[in-house]
């Protein structure tokens, strides 16, 4: 169902935005004074991105349909003969012009279904060392002792 796919896309976008916002607001400082985003938050965000990017592209393609790869050229729309048919068959809701729809389909294709899209499919997963690299960094940077102490305190156990 399209509404579910759109909800998944919203969820993904907002979790990414919130993760990156958190990483910047909770920046870290090196001994020399240089500031950088929170390492744990960045690795959690990267893990979320890499784990879910492919499913988000699938949702986008599901909502968009086959026109992502079959939409005619804008030159065909401007052609006197073919343009009248394209305007007729690419018509949807009032206010959604065929040229606008075509440009959106072209953008989706460019970002997800052509050479760049294929490259991005690999990079989304492998940039930064892949999922295992993010797992390692999360384990290295998560304040496990603090979490354990809080859990014990919540359970009424003296640590």
Language-model-derived ranges and their functions:
Residues 1-28:
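Extended amphipathic alpha-helical segments enriched in small hydrophobics
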Residues 40-159:
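Alpha-helix capping/hinge segments and adjacent helical runs
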Residues 3-8, 36-43:
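Short, charged, amphipathic alpha-helical segments
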Residues 21, 28, 32, 42-45, ...:
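Polyanion-binding and phosphate-handling cores
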